């Protein structure tokens, strides 16, 4: 499971600066979907081979009224659910009463905590950081988040215990993906193997949209139980099931449930739990409340799923019992606000009565098969060539961009790597054309598809020209002829 790093500290110590530095490598992925805003408190980060969720818990005053009364409930939950806490302080301002209050709270929680003295640029860092040792939380790590100084070392040290589980043996900051170039036979065999694996399905949504009701409807009424076993506060519940011969693992993010009445179930919402479930899933089922329409929180959760590259199915719940005018308004809003994810199937359901629930699995299987489908290099290259035949790449400085071949670069989401000359100069409009062409040709449904372009290596670059023997003889004769003419 992907680790969670919480940034904790009083206001203006640099938490947002560090958050932006850690998460900015993922901005481009969300930016590929116009109309989607990135959540400013939760994000995915990838640094020095480590992939993790980073949470900015907001500023904590730590006044005499007591720290817990001044911390937002979600900030407290973030600290509780985090695997690692980076307690950020201001080396320039020195140790404050708020820092002492925060440290006292963190010691009481027995969390894995690292004290970070930020803003050490331009000062005597060792002297400025000395007093932070009195917090009693161990070593003090120096950082200048605005310049990136000390950030990588800090993350590597904090996440070292997770290195083996994450398979940190890679170089640089590129994700390790399946880039095998399949033949037609190998692709077919691998696809058959994948179809025998359980589909991990994360059911996500903001509070009270009906996640618990839908989970219980899918599993059957006999499975309505209260999940209050140790550990469920922090981790999602993994429930295996089988449907029509296909195995699934339902990742239930509804949270700890308690029964206040016989049939009443109250759920505890956790953003962090949702993010971890999305990371671990093959397919994400996003539930939207028909009575409330598309809320900002829905778009935030959608952004997490797209950022992770997961296959996606959308279910608009509580569709029964609302009049036709509201239904028309909701559909119009979906077209307007979710038009940028035209690859995802949208279902209108009633989890309470079961209307439309059965059809969800057709789209879930379709999305999984599209996201994990293995495609041979020859087929991808043929599709690339057909796209060029239908619409030639543009001219760049009088020369046509030349695309040579394509191969798979990863799955879930599908990634197509295209090699060629001057591909870095391809306009975004042509890249979008090619992405849509590949999606149509491969019949990809329910998952985003990514294209990556790589320049062909020039074998003569940075090499001096070496003449053949005959060219060398001709050169000598020419030089001799020129020399004879000058002497005459």
UniProtKB/Swiss-Prot annotation:
Residues 469-488 are annotated as: Disordered. GTPase that plays an essential role in the late steps of ribosome biogenesis. InterPro entries: G_ENGA, GTP-bd, GTPase_Der, KH_dom-like, KH_dom-like_a/b, P-loop_NTPase, Small_GTP-bd. Keywords: GTP-binding, Nucleotide-binding, Repeat, Ribosome biogenesis. Residues 473-488 have a biased composition (Basic residues). GTP 2 binds at residues 205-212, 252-256, 317-320. Residues 3-166, 199-372 form the EngA-type G domain. The keyword Cell membrane does not apply. The lineage of its organism: Bacteria, Pseudomonadati, Pseudomonadota, Gammaproteobacteria, Alteromonadales. GTP 1 binds at residues 9-16, 56-60, 118-121. Associates with the 50S ribosomal subunit. It comes from Shewanella putrefaciens (strain CN-32 / ATCC BAA-453). Residues 373-457 form the KH-like domain. Pfam families: KH_dom-like (PF14714), MMR_HSR1 (PF01926). Gene3D superfamilies: 3.30.300.20, P-loop containing nucleotide triphosphate hydrolases. This is GTPase Der. PROSITE patterns: G_ENGA (PS51712). Belongs to the TRAFAC class TrmE-Era-EngA-EngB-Septin-like GTPase superfamily. EngA (Der) GTPase family. One of its GO terms (biological process) is ribosome biogenesis.
